[in-house]
Curated annotation (Swiss-Prot):
PDZ domain location: 510-582
Sites of Phosphoserine modification: 357, 359, 367, 381, 425
Organism annotation: Mus musculus
Gene Ontology molecular-function annotations: ATPase binding; cytoskeletal protein binding; phosphotyrosine residue binding; protein tyrosine phosphatase activity; sodium channel regulator activity
Protein name: Tyrosine-protein phosphatase non-receptor type 3
Membrane topology, as annotated: Peripheral membrane protein
Amino acid sequence: MTSRLRALGGRINNTRTSELPKEKTRSEVICSIRFLDGLVQTFKVNKQDLGQSLLDMAYGHLGVTEKEYFGLQHGDDPVDSPRWLEASKPLRKQLKGGFPCTLHFRVRYFIPDPNTLQQEQTRHLYFLQLKMDVCEGRLTCPLNSAVVLASYAVQSHFGDFNSSIHHPGYLADSQFIPDQNDDFLSKVESLHEQHSGLKQSEAESCYINIARTLDFYGVELHGGRDLHNLDLMIGIASAGIAVYRKYICTSFYPWVNILKISFKRKKFFIHQRQKQAESREHIVAFNMLNYRSCKNLWKSCVEHHSFFQAKKLLPQEKNVLSQYWTLGSRNPKKSVNNQYCKKVIGGMVWNPVMRRSLSVERLETKSLPSRSPPITPNWRSPRLRHEIRKPRHSSADNLANEMTYITETEDVFYTYKGPLSPKDSDSEVSQNHSPHRESLSENNPAQSCLTQKSSSSVSPSSNAPGSCSPDGVDQRFLEDYHKVTKGGFVEDASQYYCDKSDDGDGYLVLIRITPDEEGRFGFNLKGGVDQKMPLVVSRINPESPADTCMPKLNEGDQIVLINGRDISEHTHDQVVMFIKASRESHSRELALVIRRKAVRSLAEIRSEDELSQLFPEAMFPACPEGGDSLEGSMELLKKGLESGTVLIQFEQLYRKKPGLAVSFAKLPQNLDKNRYKDVLPYDTTRVLLQGNEDYINASYVNMEMPAANLVNKYIATQGPLPNTCAQFWQVVWDQKLSLVVMLTTLTERGRTKCHQYWPDPPDIMDHGIFHIQCQTEDCTIAYVSREMLVTNTETGEEHTVTHLQYVAWPDHGVPDDSSDFLEFVKYVRSLRVDGEPALVHCSAGIGRTGVLVTMETAMCLIERNLPVYPLDIVRKMRDQRAMMVQTSSQYKFVCEAILRVYEEGLVQRLDPS
């Protein structure tokens, strides 16, 4: 028997029981933990204990309640291969470097929006970690951003500036960035004075909100090499895996595009979802320094994915959602639900059959509603600028709020990727994003009667991409649906715009219903994924809210979205639960997007109001009757905003003018000069550069106003890329432009929106044959004004340019108030030079750019007492550059701003004589 055990690798344990306590005593060791405040605490542990015991000691020492964000990092590991203490593994197998040992308490998972953290202590620890990372150079940032960050750190530590205590040089012993100098500290001291009144927690929140806009926020970097042995960094972020060369992101692989990650010896593999018309799996490979670092990277990827996927789910929804996600992990405890997880040797598997993939030719990103502050040294700090949202507590009684929470914290990182040379191994992939399925599982009758009273409004009933967002409905409500079904492009959210017609028959209508006093909506449903049939309205109770709303809900209408939620994969009972949950929201409204197969006969339409809703007279307006005066056009605009018809008209308008080619933009040598692959200039209106390379993604947009004998000229262009800055300044030089208007920050929530094509004052930056010097920089609460000197190094000629950067546009959607924007437009008008184009850009050069052109054109017309038709303005713009004014929310914003300018007299009328 003994020999048999030895043959199998076993051995007989003859250890006496009396020896066990002595063994345990000898295994006690000392571990030191360095916390984020710099203090070191020693703990006595047993080597046989699991890592969780030491983690619990660290958590208990600080009194941390949100423990999931933090971990213990090994202190002796290289910077480019961080290793974390595993909770489920014995300490003796992890701490092999001898005792006593030192570990570092650190934030491991940085969520996209730290404002949603529940505990102030957690936010304080985030602040300490970010401050340390900036100070030690792990989190790089521009000098101007570093000044602002340091000023908030000073406010947190010293409190309000006091001239009697804080004498010049009081920060001499403070360290904020690796290579700071006296000039840097003097700027910090100056800015500290502006933060008077901010509490410590508020200053720290401001610090976090700026830090989270930096490119490397929340990115865990691992060193590696490509297949040609060239150095690169692999970063693990909340939404996927990024590849950096010389600290520039060259590729990004979202989790939704990754089927499996694996490793073999020193090679790390990313298995991507197949593209359309591809029969083979697409695999990207990297070389790591050694087997340990390769396994370490793989493990960290698995744990990051598991953590951030779980954070997207409400606790009540995890069990249901696990049906749609199949995740494999070496540690099943890390995944959402153990029974639905596969264990895969050396890899993580997603089951593509269990999820509905969107178009693989698209990349979507979502931004948070909070604003990204600009990176300028004179940025003001008052609370009104930093709209720090209160953390929301998850509650099953308020499903609507939880749905918003999930949407807002969902993040997909995006950085422009130009085509790499053939020697680069991490090739660009097409990327997509599938919404996760959210549901509550409760027992409800197979058919339920639901009712409601009051009003609703119509939504776009067209096949054009995009959506109508009437007042009171979340702006993401229809936009997300059209992005899912039609590939609709949103400037702040997508790399592609795909103009696809809807696959289904009929047209879409948005219906809003408010329940009656008893909480009933008044209609029955049949169908669901469990019944293997679409969800259809089977019965409408007479005189119920569903029957009296306009447009009314009809029997046979197919339910597509409920409060912005795609219900195509949900059971009947789950859908009923979603509808009931809407009664608990603040507005109590139920917003349904339904597909209606055919328009009812006129005999079925009971009122003229309903007829005008379904067939608005101004669906294809020319010059509406009574609208040939300014007053008449403003009255029509006001009524259109109230009824929602202006948004329907906007959705009916073509996004690209039929028949206009974009062939030059698609030439092979020009492809990498386009930030977005479907936002391209028409051949007929594109700006031609002087010289051999004549292409830039820019269009001439001339807004002619014959009745005013006026033409406003623009050059609308995308935000420059690192490889197009020289062409950008070539346009400025060729056209002798004196005004450049920028409508975005450089990054919004860590995503690059525009490359910085100008230097910080008073530095000089070279782009091609041009020297650019920023001579002055003046910051206000809404915009930054710069004076730049452009010098042609070949001729020695100089040209002065005014650069205006609007920084108050929120990361998501549109501004809540138009005051700042209107002041900015008025300032732009004051700097215009007669007959000279103004160069305007945002990120794609169509959304916010179109809003500004529309607003300035409308102001000119109001000033001259001429009628204003916003849709005609948009049509004229789209005849010259596709997709100008990009979303319904942008169009609604500019229409409301135009009406406000008229009603409040914000523009001085010119004397008709």
